[in-house]
Amino acid sequence: MASYGDDGVELTELTLGPPGASARRARRGRKNGHPPPSSSMIQAAYFVKVSMDGTPYLRKVDVAAYGDYLELVEALNDMFYCSTIGLMDGYGEWEHAVVYEDGDGDWMLVGDVPWEMFVSSCKRMRVMRACEARGLSSNA
């Protein structure tokens, strides 16, 4: 129950600390005795760097924010202002293909493994010309 002063204004507790300290306390669940949010409510972000052949810059993508490969490819098309990025399930269809480096350091085509396995093993991604990516395909 909130306590009120003589003028009817709700009294609040003032805490001092460095900037962001209250947010950190809230994330840890210590503020006001509230329990931390359940793990089912928290979705971890998993950022990886993405490069594209012919561009002088990198982008960072949270792969855990997407539900499947098609959403990821659409986002990459938007990021690099390109509409020629696609999955390598059909040859000659796309000018660019997306490959990723897994935990073992191997480069693999995006779409070759189940989505959950990709999210957990992707270390970085590269958008390369489709003709160069043909040798990486598991069904080539």
Swiss-Prot record:
Pfam families: AUX_IAA
Cleaved signal peptide residues: none
Annotated localization: Nucleus
Induction context: Not induced by auxin.
One GO cellular component term: nucleus
Taxonomy, superkingdom: Eukaryota
Motif interval(s): EAR-like (transcriptional repression): 14-18
Subunit annotation: Homodimers and heterodimers.
The protein's role, per its UniProt record: Aux/IAA proteins are short-lived transcriptional factors that function as repressors of early auxin response genes at low auxin concentrations.
Protein name: Auxin-responsive protein IAA26
Species of origin: Oryza sativa subsp. japonica
Gene that produces this protein: IAA26
